[in-house]
């Protein structure tokens, strides 16, 4: 599959920046060519090969493994076996081939996690990659004449990245079995990131559709993708997604574990869950949402809620606890889970199984009891040299959002916060990409490191490709707005460049510098089509006599 970059991002091309510590490492960026000028504008690019016109991607073969040699050079892993694909896989058979070997950290040896290396003072290729990726945008901002930066630029160096990872304020999700991924960093001292959820259901299940959603999501800017499949072919869908994804892939393993016991919650066990996370770690999943903070004693606090327990994983574990009258087996066996995670460098995403699912339930006792427990689990994970982030709500009115961030930073020792929205009102089914983007922008400003998108289909059905696009774009806007509020110079540079184009009536540049150029151009051309509309010093809103910018330019002239 090859995304047509000239249609999605006109006047753009892919460039590669060489690293210094690791000269063989090249960082891909997208470059916009400013019309009638030698100027170029650099952008962070999450799309990997999909925005490189010189690379044709065949989804049945997977994308290139850029990290394979980096991992091999560390000499701390060993091959378990060659990968196998189920014989009934549709369109997946060619993926695993003879060349993919499943890796694991050497038995009895040190962890193979980015956190372990960082604590040892080692700057890995992954760390330099993310430093170059983020710092190139800061250098560009500093070099733009006339741009008034809100704060002094703090250079993002490989050493700064290492320090942030070492203290747990940032993570670089990098499973050793996902060498196709381009390193990215999640932490509040870096650009705010976004995640896109995809995956089938028992009602709608199609492998090809889910892979295309992933490609669409990363092309429009998703920094990570979660496969939340609960229907048929879970293993094969995930295989095709991981092998073709240039961004980290996350999952909620309890979904597949439940699928293995035919959907009967009472038949779940730690043994089934353990088998599932090993299977997924061997495939290359970069982070797992694990609902280990849903303790049996907390469940009673949800009984008076308006909407009860709305997390699927949280509801599954709560039901299991009550059926067996036992403590959550994910909590009870957490240290054993850590041993597995550190052998593959799978990052913990500690799930908020008791998050509020309605405005009336926001910031209640159950939510914050679980958050305290997640803070305890953060310390245990770090003691095992596992990378860890913490998930957050949910449905929260605007005036209660900041409290969530303050408590999370306090309870969870500044582990990166990863929130679903939050949705700021319950009254807009069909528009929850908007209700949640409002909350996402605010919580990102307050310090959340990654925002999980919400699509227009939230609460209504399984998102299709257009819903995925709408969700990603809504959240790219929210993340960018948060970065502006935090004073990130890279974000100010893009606003400045677009505003200059707008004031100069450079319509094509204005389209191309936007988050969704095709939509901007389409809306403009509905009333002023053709070449003449691209040179006009007005739009159809004001016309030639009432355009404020045209009048303002006349004053200056």
UniProtKB/Swiss-Prot annotation:
EC numbers on record: 4.1.99.17
InterPro entries linked to this entry: ThiC (IPR037509), ThiC-associated_dom (IPR025747), ThiC/Bza_core_dom (IPR038521), ThiC/BzaA/B (IPR002817)
GO biological process: thiamine biosynthetic process; thiamine diphosphate biosynthetic process
UniProt keywords, alphabetically: 4Fe-4S, Iron, Iron-sulfur, Lyase, Metal-binding, S-adenosyl-L-methionine, Thiamine biosynthesis, Zinc
Keyword S-adenosyl-L-methionine found: yes
GO molecular function: 4 iron, 4 sulfur cluster binding; carbon-carbon lyase activity; zinc ion binding
Cofactors (names): [4Fe-4S] cluster
Coiled-coil parts of chain: none
Enzyme class: lyase
Catalytic activity: 5-amino-1-(5-phospho-beta-D-ribosyl)imidazole + S-adenosyl-L-methionine = 4-amino-2-methyl-5-(phosphooxymethyl)pyrimidine + CO + 5'-deoxyadenosine + formate + L-methionine + 3 H(+)
Listed GO CC annotations: cytosol
Subunit structure: Homodimer.
Family: Belongs to the ThiC family.
Name by which UniProt lists this protein: Phosphomethylpyrimidine synthase
Gene name of this polypeptide: thiC
């Amino acid at each position: 599959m090859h995304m047509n970059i000239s249609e999605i991002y006109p006047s753009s091309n892919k460039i590669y920046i060489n690293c210094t510590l690791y000269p063989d490492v090249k960082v891909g960026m997208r470059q916009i060519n400013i019309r009638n000028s030698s100027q170029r504008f650099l952008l962070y690019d999450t799309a990997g090969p999909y925005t490189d016109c010189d690379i044709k991607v065949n989804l049945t073969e997977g994308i290139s493994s850029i990290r394979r040699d980096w991992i091999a050079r560390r000499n701390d892993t060993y091959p378990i076996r060659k990968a196998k694909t189920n014989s009934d896989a549709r369109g997946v058979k060619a993926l695993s081939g003879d060349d993919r070997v499943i890796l694991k950290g050497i038995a009895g040896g040190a962890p193979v996690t980015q956190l372990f290396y960082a604590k040892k003072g080692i700057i890995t290729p992954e760390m330099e990659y993310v430093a170059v990726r983020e710092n190139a945008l800061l250098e560009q901002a500093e070099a733009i004449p006339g741009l008034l930066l809100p704060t002094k630029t703090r250079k993002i160096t490989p050493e700064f990245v290492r320090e942030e990872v070492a203290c747990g304020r940032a993570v670089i999700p990098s499973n050793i079995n996902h060498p196709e991924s381009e390193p990215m960093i999640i932490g509040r001292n870096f650009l705010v990131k976004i995640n896109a959820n995809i995956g089938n259901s028992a009602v709608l299940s199609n492998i090809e559709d889910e892979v295309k959603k992933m490609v669409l999501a990363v092309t429009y800017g998703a920094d990570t993708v979660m496969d939340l499949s609960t229907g048929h072919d879970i293993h094969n869908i995930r295989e095709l997604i991981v092998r073709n994804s240039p961004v980290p892939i996350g999952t909620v393993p309890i979904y597949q574990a439940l699928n293995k016991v035919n959907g009967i919650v009472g038949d779940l066990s730690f043994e089934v869950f353990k088998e599932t996370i090993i299977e997924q770690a061997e495939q290359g999943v970069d982070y797992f949402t694990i609902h280990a903070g849903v303790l049996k004693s907390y469940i009673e606090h949800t009984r008076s809620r308006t909407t009860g327990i709305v997390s699927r994983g949280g509801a599954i574990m709560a039901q299991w606890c009550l059926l067996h009258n036992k403590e959550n087996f994910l909590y009870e066996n957490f240290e054993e889970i850590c041993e597995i995670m550190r052998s593959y460098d799978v990052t913990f995403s500690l799930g908020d199984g008791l998050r509020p699912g309605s405005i009336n339930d926001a910031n209640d006792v159950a939510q914050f009891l679980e958050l305290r427990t997640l803070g305890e689990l953060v310390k245990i994970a770090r003691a095992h040299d596992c990378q860890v982030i913490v998930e957050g709500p949910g449905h929260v009115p605007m005036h209660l959002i900041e409290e969530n961030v303050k408590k999370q930073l306090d309870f969870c020792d500044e582990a990166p916060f990863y929130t679903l929205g939050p949705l700021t009102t319950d009254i807009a089914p069909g528009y929850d990409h908007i209700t949640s983007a409002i909350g996402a922008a605010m919580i990102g400003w307050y310090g959340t490191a990654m925002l999980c998108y919400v699509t227009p289909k939230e609460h209504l059905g399984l998102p299709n490709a257009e819903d995925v696009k709408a969700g990603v774009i809504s959240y790219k806007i929210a993340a960018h707005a948060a970065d502006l509020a935090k004073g990130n110079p890279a974000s100010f540079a893009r606003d400045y460049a677009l505003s200059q184009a707008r004031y100069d009536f450079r319509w094509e540049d204005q389209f191309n510098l936007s988050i969704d150029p095709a939509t901007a151009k389409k809306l403009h051309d509905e009333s002023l089509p053709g070449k003449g509309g691209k040179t006009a010093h007005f739009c159809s809103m004001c016309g030639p006599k009432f355009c404020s910018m045209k009048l303002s330019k006349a004053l200056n002239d």
